[in-house]
Amino acid sequence: MEHRFLRTEMVLGDRALDRLSRCHVAVFGLGGVGSYAAEILARSEVGELTLVDQDTLSLTNINRQLYALSSTVGEYKAEVAARRCRDINPDIRVHPLCATYDAAHREDFFAGKFDYIADCIDLVTCKLDLIQQAGERGIPIISALGTGNKLDPTLLQVTDISRTSVCPLARVMRRELRDRGIRHLQVVYSPEPAAETRQLEAPSPGRRSVPASVPWVPSTAGILMASAIVRNLIANESE
């Protein structure tokens, strides 16, 4: 019988799709990486998504963020994301959270049981706390590292953080995670050196500069992240 996920079932099999339909994945951060990760998860028939982002869409998001359109500027990313996911799959259960994840409010985000977490958070302190909490709670997690100031999407890869190099964020994360006793973490990252950029926009409070971006690098990172999540969730289920 024809259905919206038939072409995926032809590759993965019905047991894998049944497994995905019973999974709950949380995506923290719905920017250039997270918006595409959530999209692929919804189109892979993941049955339940928690989508976390405190921001509203702005004009400068349009170059790289899936939900950013002239018609959605000013709307909350999490709400636009949830609406789109429901349009893809009316049976999906979506929980949009227009809030900031941090250590002080972490318990607000773990009310449900997650089968996987996609970490697309920008702030290092929040990122580290989420990773540590996932480990303590036994939840698999994959983290996106830096995709700004990069041009070549073919250099992106899914690997362990212990195998990363060049990326400044990876270097900081390795050090901070070691201090927390965490040696291994699945990440999406690129060893591409940062491109030379010009500062044409004032940085937000707490940032020294605004990362430059192109449409094709963050989106590819999000797709790779979702692919890794789906394939890990259905390991041993494909026919």
Task: List where the protein language model places each region.
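N-terminal charged helix/coil linker that caps or initiates catalytic domains
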Residues: 1-25
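Glycine-rich phosphate/adenylate-binding loop
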Residues: 2, 21, 110-114, 121-126, ...
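Conserved N-terminal Rossmann-fold NAD(P)-binding element of oxidoreductases
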Residues: 27-29, 52
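Hydrophobic/small residue at the entry helix of a nucleotide-binding pocket
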Residues: 33
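Glycine-rich phosphate-binding loop and adjoining beta1-alpha1-beta2 segment
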Residues: 46, 51-89
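Conserved SAM/SAH-binding loop
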Residues: 98-106
